[in-house]
Amino acid sequence: GSSATEILSHYFPGASIRHIDTINVGSPVLSETSPLWVGLLQNRPEINFTLDEGSATLCFDDTGLCAVTANEGERWKFGSDGAGSCRFSRQDDDGSYVPVEPAGLCSASARPSHQSTVFGIPRKARSYRAGNLRFRTSPASGRYHLSLELGIEDYVRGVQELPDFWPGSSLEAQAIVSRTMVVRRLLDVGSAAAFNDWELELCACHLKDDDPE
């Protein structure tokens, strides 16, 4: 069978393969441990999530204050407290949500306590093992976006367009294409810390998880 390089040469004539370390000079975003924000939900009145495995620390990103620990099996939501701030709320046994102290500005995160932590997003019926959940507000609508912050290789491992029984060279070629697209997007947009109003309004992300590319 063809090698990964031969496959890529067939579909992308004239293209060459470079290691990511050779293109990150002058591009600090590629040196970050987890530079990529993948949009999971956009413009929601609130964000619901679960701890399917492990635990996570819930934090307000503007101050770095971590409000509480979310434990395995718990259901949470993030949204407005009705007084100009945001809160995390935990679902009680009767199904109601109980806000936890303190409130904070509406830029927040859920940070895994362990590598084995798994977040569930009920609205998408999906779970996510790698990365931090990031909650951001749309400047236009005031509603909430949810993004998954993760490393480039974590994202590439999560891409499964080809079945596992395909030749290893095909899977390798797919990984190279996926990595290239992510790096290109990171270079175009830059660090999440520098998202402009348009990017914050759209999704607070570099790409959406249903991006057709």
Predicted features along the sequence, with ranges:
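Conserved, single-site charged/polar hotspot
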Residues: G1-E213
